[in-house]
């Protein structure tokens, strides 16, 4: 997949990311015990939890380097490897960079940034999903 620009080759990533985007938009809860990237709900299987984001990381093809992207938050520029998939179009996905929450007392580990990027999924070697969470201002 990494060196093949055939759009049909990225379908496994496209399917997973489309599931994540759909879940983030609807926030439905159901009782299923799968614990994978395409688990059919965000967070726990009770209505007492509320999550709106399934954070993801990307690894490049070949050398499996963790992707990082720049962001600016509160006047400080840094890099993050944690993203929120906002949209999927064919073999491309648009992601928002998530920054570590500066409020160390918060239960929510990430905050939203205004940094967005589009990634060609043919350049991705692996996707890793992090625990579901709530991100404000999404």
Where are these regions (language model features)?
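Short glycine-rich, low-complexity segments
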Residues: 1-89, 94-138
């Amino acid at each position: 997949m990494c060196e093949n620009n055939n759009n049909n080759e990225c379908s496994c990533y496209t399917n997973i990311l489309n599931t994540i985007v759909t879940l983030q938009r609807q926030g439905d809860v159901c009782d299923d015990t799968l614990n994978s990237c395409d688990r059919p709900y965000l967070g726990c299987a009770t209505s007492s939890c509320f999550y709106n984001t399934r954070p993801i990381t990307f690894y490049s093809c070949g050398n499996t380097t963790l992707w990082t992207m720049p962001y600016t938050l509160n006047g400080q520029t840094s890099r993050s490897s944690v993203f929120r998939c906002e949209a999927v179009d064919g073999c491309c996905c648009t992601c928002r960079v998530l920054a570590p929450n500066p409020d160390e007392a918060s239960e929510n580990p990430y905050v939203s940034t205004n940094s967005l990027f589009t990634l060609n999924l043919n350049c991705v070697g692996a996707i890793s999903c992090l625990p579901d969470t709530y991100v404000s201002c999404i």
